[in-house]
Amino acid sequence: MEIRWLSILVDIPADRFDRSMEFWSAVTGWRPGRPIGDKDEYVPLDPPAGDRYLWFQRIGRDIPGCHLDLHVDDLDAAAAEAQERGARLVNSVDGLRVLDTPAGQPFCFVTEEPGRTRQAPPPPETASGRHLVDQLCFDLPAPDFERDADFWAALTGWRRRGQEDEFDRIAVPAWLPAQFLLQQLDEDAAEGPHAHLDLSADDRDAEAARHRQLGAEPVRRTADWTTLRDPAGLTYCVTGRRTGLRFT
């Protein structure tokens, strides 16, 4: 299976969708694109250069979240391979297959346009420096961590870099727009598997302050990242990684 592109889907409850879109458009400087879907439930943010990869989905449930879409040529073959590796097929519709990882993390396969060549957008730049939504972090309960880390490496063909403390990485090719980080939750964590956005920033504190001015709520600050909550209640992190740094 060849992965042709990837998209990050931010799942936002319908009653908070417009406010969240406004916030993330202001954060990135990217304008909302044309909605698609039977109910116009999918809206991209379109960068001025490069290809879109950050989408927002209007959902009926009350809890926001994130999931990954992998673009492939053959949906059925990709879904079959994922199931052979332990995934569960949840739904099958035209142009889309919805699955859960062995740990229960939702993800999708979508049909890539034949012959399409894509390019990752460059980082936006503001007074606080460069910044970019460039990582999806999979938050996994301790008993599920190894199983899902091995699943993603086997499914994509991209190697695990090796666990350090509670983290591991899947070595995503540098031409794709976002990286995968896996985080092992504490043994006593009540949450099930979920995912969150990470942003890299040249100046983490200045970037986090800009987000607060745009309406984000501060949650906590550690030595390596600052956790915030967007106006829809979506928790995400601004990290101290150098903007554009890729782990391959």
Please report, for each region that a protein language model flagged, where it lies by residue.
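Vicinal oxygen chelate
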Residues: 1-3, 12, 83-134, 140, ...
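Core segments of cupin and vicinal oxygen chelate
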Residues: 1-52, 77, 84, 90-92, ...
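Short hydrophobic/aromatic beta-strand micro-patches
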Residues: 11, 69-71, 139-141, 198-202
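Domain-length accessory/inserted modules outside core catalytic folds
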Residues: 45, 187-188
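Conserved donor-binding loop and adjoining core beta-sheet/short helix segment
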Residues: 56-60
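Short glycine/serine/proline-enriched coil/turn segments at secondary-structure junctions
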Residues: 62, 188-191
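Short proline/glycine-enriched turn/loop motifs at strand-loop junctions of beta-rich domains
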Residues: 63, 73-75, 201-205
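Eukaryotic phosphotyrosine signaling hubs
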Residues: 65-67, 192-195
